Amino acid sequence: MRFRPSIVALLSVCFGLLTFLYSGSAFAVDKSQLTYDDIVNTGLANVCPEISSFTRGTIEVEPNTKYFVSDFCMEPQEYFVKEEPVNKRQKAEYVKGKVLTRQTTSLEQIRGSIAVGADGTLTFKEKDGIDFQPITVLLPGGEEVPFFFTVKNFTGTTEPGFTSINSSTDFVGDFNVPSYRGAGFLDPKARGLYTGYDNAVALPSAADKFRTNKKETPLGKGTLSLQVTQVDGSTGEIAGIFESEQPSDTDLGAKEPLDVKVRGIFYGRVDTDV
């Protein structure tokens, strides 16, 4: 019993250290200063960087000039799926879901560009990077909804009249959503798009089974809103919140997609050089 105060003190230090690491501070997410052993199995690899202090600075931009975005990162924090109501008189509503995917949900190392139009319109175009993650969400009723979280080929614009990137800058636009499964994927009955059986074994191809037998990899469309809330003009860092809406997985065209809404935070760096 005499060791109880020491144990309590040790636990307090441990919990304090964990709180510090996950507090979202700049040190906690500065992966360049951490080793592999510091990051592995901690969840830090799934955390986007943050601007060290709250700031509402500006990054001046000039018309007919292109700026480059690097280290762009998007960290999802909330997931919603639109469910059809039981009562036909009610409207379909988004229901909050619980993410089942562990520590591999963020998009990072994304590159892009921001072009400034003559009227002050800013256009953000995504180029490449780790810009997709397969995620599964659990709904309150027990249904699991897989979807391909991505911002591929995102092109977002602002309202005209901007002479700088500031905390009032909002990029809104569309992006492509590739199929959750590839063309070479085989379902449990060995059916695929370009390989495998044309229809289920020992089951004739009937009209009601046509959609399940005929595999497709449809390209969907999504919308994304990036709301800049923090800008550090000295370092070119920007950060803010995002809201994305996109279709869910269709099981290679076998079922109708559900509408998925994702909310979270983002971070990036803006520079005049590549």
Swiss-Prot record:
Subunit (UniProt): PSII is composed of 1 copy each of membrane proteins PsbA, PsbB, PsbC, PsbD, PsbE, PsbF, PsbH, PsbI, PsbJ, PsbK, PsbL, PsbM, PsbT, PsbX, PsbY, PsbZ, Psb30/Ycf12, peripheral proteins PsbO, CyanoQ (PsbQ), PsbU, PsbV and a large number of cofactors. It forms dimeric complexes. Contacts PsbQ.
Which residues does UniProt assign to the signal peptide? 1-28
Source gene?
psbO
Q: Which InterPro entries match?
A: OMP/PagP_b-brl, PsbO
Q: What is this protein called?
A: Photosystem II extrinsic protein O
Q: Quote the function comment for this protein.
A: One of the extrinsic, lumenal subunits of photosystem II (PSII), which stabilize and protect the oxygen-evolving complex. PSII is a light-driven water plastoquinone oxidoreductase, using light energy to abstract electrons from H(2)O, generating a proton gradient subsequently used for ATP formation. Required for dimerization of PSII and for binding of PsbQ to PSII.
Protein's UniProt keywords contain Zinc-finger: no
Q: What happens when the gene is disrupted?
A: No photoautotrophic growth, no oxygen evolution. Decreased growth rate at 30 degrees Celsius with 25 umol photons/m(2)/s, no growth in Ca(2+) depleted medium, decreased growth in Cl(-) depleted medium; further decreased in a double psbO-psbQ mutant. No dimeric PSII forms, PsbQ does not associate with PSII.
Write out the annotated subcellular location: Cellular thylakoid membrane
What is the topology of this protein in the membrane according to its UniProt annotation?
A: Peripheral membrane protein
What's a GO biological-process term for it? Answer: photosystem II stabilization
Keywords in alphabetical order, please.
Answer: Manganese, Membrane, Photosynthesis, Photosystem II, Signal, Thylakoid
- GO molecular function annotation: oxygen evolving activity
Which family is this protein grouped under? Belongs to the PsbO family.
**Entry keyword NAD:** no
Q: Which GO terms describe its cellular component?
A: photosystem II oxygen evolving complex; plasma membrane-derived thylakoid membrane; plasma membrane-derived thylakoid photosystem II
